[in-house]
Regions:
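Aromatic- and acidic-residue-enriched segments that line the glycan-binding/catalytic groove
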Residues: 1-14, 48-88, 138
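Active-site-adjacent "subsite" loops/lids of carbohydrate-active enzymes
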Residues: 1-41, 81-95, 110, 206-208
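The substrate-binding groove and active-site-proximal loops of carbohydrate-active enzymes
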Residues: 12-31, 90-106, 131, 159-170, ...
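Conserved, mostly hydrophobic/aromatic
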Residues: 30, 37, 46, 116, ...
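Aromatic- and acid-rich polysaccharide-binding/catalytic face
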Residues: 44, 49, 82-92, 142-172, ...
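Aromatic-lined carbohydrate-recognition surfaces of secreted/lumenal glycan-active proteins
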Residues: 47-51, 96-143, 188-200
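Alpha-helical scaffolding within the catalytic cores
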Residues: 135-151, 171-183, 210-211
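Substrate-binding cleft of secreted/luminal carbohydrate-active enzymes
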Residues: 160-169, 192-263
Length: 267
């Protein structure tokens, strides 16, 4: 239904194969789906995984080279923009467009999270955004780049940032982690950092230990990994997937052991 409510390229007016989450029909559809899950299962939370506007260009580069084209400039977005700002939505992104996209992108997640919390306050809501740093790591104005807007949502419990490639410098890991923890604390959320468990393994598995030590030392509340068993047997499997999976598990046990020991001392 409502297949016309899709995202549109700003430069070419091409209708893309992605729903526009600023249309009321998709917002209703998404909220209703999530509510059905909450009402008919014993799920304990929801995870908003790297939400973002579509890329008219089909790829992104590590240095942010996905081009200048953007979405969404569909009839619904154009109408909302003009009603708010008093002029036609431009094809070239300006500051008003950036603000509009940030603001509108949050509506679907905020409204759905609110409905879920009203149904069951115990549901844990996590929002995971891309681990960007200026324009270095595929920022490309995805729509959720304003971390303050995301982390300040009163219906989110956990502020999470995505996986970082093992090939990137340690300083980048530290910078993203520092910002993640700071943003979570600012808005009284738990912080979460991810460990890369697919595609590429670190050259030395000791990098896993270092990353976990870094996250722990910087006050990260939660650690997460994708994907299961290093993607073993899938097209995204890491080199030596089971060895990587085992190393990640060893670090989880190590961190949990330290936490349990600390709890025993406090009690």
């Amino acid at each position: 239904n409502n297949i016309h409510n899709r995202q549109v390229s700003a430069f070419t007016d091409e209708v893309l194969n992605f729903a526009c989450f600023n249309t009321q029909s998709f917002r209703d559809y998404f909220r209703n789906c999530c509510m059905k899950i909450a009402q008919n299962t014993e799920v304990d939370g929801f995870f908003w995984d790297e939400p973002h506007y579509a890329y008219p260009k089909s790829y992104a580069s590590i240095t942010g080279g996905a081009g200048d084209d953007w979405s969404c400039r569909c009839p619904v977005c154009k109408k909302k923009f003009e009603e708010y700002y008093g002029y036609e939505m431009p094809r070239i992104m300006n500051d008003d467009v950036k603000q509009f996209r940030w603001r509108e992108a949050m509506v679907i997640l905020r409204e759905t999270s609110k409905a879920l919390k009203e149904y069951n306050p115990a549901l844990e809501i996590t929002c995971c955004v891309h681990a960007t740093l200026n324009t270095y790591y595929v920022t490309e104005l995805r729509g959720y780049d304003n971390w303050d807007l995301v982390a300040s949502c009163p219906y989110f419990d956990v502020f999470s940032t995505t996986i970082i490639s093992w090939d990137l410098p340690e300083k980048f890991f530290a910078d993203v982690t520092e910002r993640t923890v700071r943003m979570a604390k600012k808005y009284n959320k738990q912080s979460e950092r991810w460990i890369m468990g697919y595609n590429k393994s670190p050259k030395d598995l000791a990098q896993v230990d270092k990353a976990v030590d870094l996250y722990e030392s910087m006050g990260v509340d939660r650690l997460a990994t994708w994907t299961y068993r290093g993607g073993y047997g899938t097209v995204v499997q890491a080199e030596n997937p089971l060895a990587l999976w085992d190393r990640i598990g060893e670090n989880y046990r190590r961190v949990r052991g330290k936490q349990e020991e600390a709890q025993e001392k406090r009690s």
